[in-house]
C-alpha cells in the first residue's frame, strides 16, 4: 500500500483530472514511502523464500518497479509482464490478465497486448478499464475508428467523473489525430 500511496499527490491535476502514471511528476512522489515499501517488500520476500511469493508480494513487486523507475521510459516492462504472469498463476482472474496484457503491450508491442486483451472480451465487456486499455492499444496500432469507439464505450462505463472526463478527452485527441 505504501508503494501505491507514495504516488497519490501526482495522480490528479489541480482541476481533479487524472494524470496517467507515465505523465506524473515523479518529484511529487513520496520517496520515504517508496523506500519503506521497498524495505518491507524485500523483508517479506526473504521470509517467503525463493519462488514462494504470494499474490500480495507479487503486486507489491510490480508497484515497486513502477515506483523506482527514474522515468516512465525506464520502467522495466518485461519484468512487470513476467510478474503479472506469475500473479496469474497464483491468483488467476480477468483483471490480472488485463493488467498482464497491458504490460505485455508495453514490453512487446501493442499487437501482442491487444491479442491478449481480445481474449478477455467476453469476461470484461462491462468494465471501463478493459475498453480503455483496448482503445489505447488500437490507437497505438493506428486503428483510429475502432479506438474512438472503444474510448466512447470506456467513458460510458466509467464510474467516476475524472475517469469519464479523461476518457472523453482521449477520445477527442485520438479522433483529432
Task: Say what each PLM segment does.
Residues 1-85:
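Amphipathic helix-loop-helix modules that constitute alpha-helical solenoid scaffolds
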Residues 1, 27, 67-70, 103-104, ...:
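Residue-level signature for tetratricopeptide repeat
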Residues 144-162, 172:
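TPR/TPR-like (Sel1-like) alpha-helical repeat modules
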Residues 48, 84, 91, 123-124, ...:
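Alpha-helical junction/boundary sensor with strong preference for TPR arrays
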Residues 59, 95-96, 129, 166:
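Start-of-helix register in tetratricopeptide repeats
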Residues 2, 59, 63, 99, ...:
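"A position-specific structural signal for the A-helix of alpha-solenoid helical repeats
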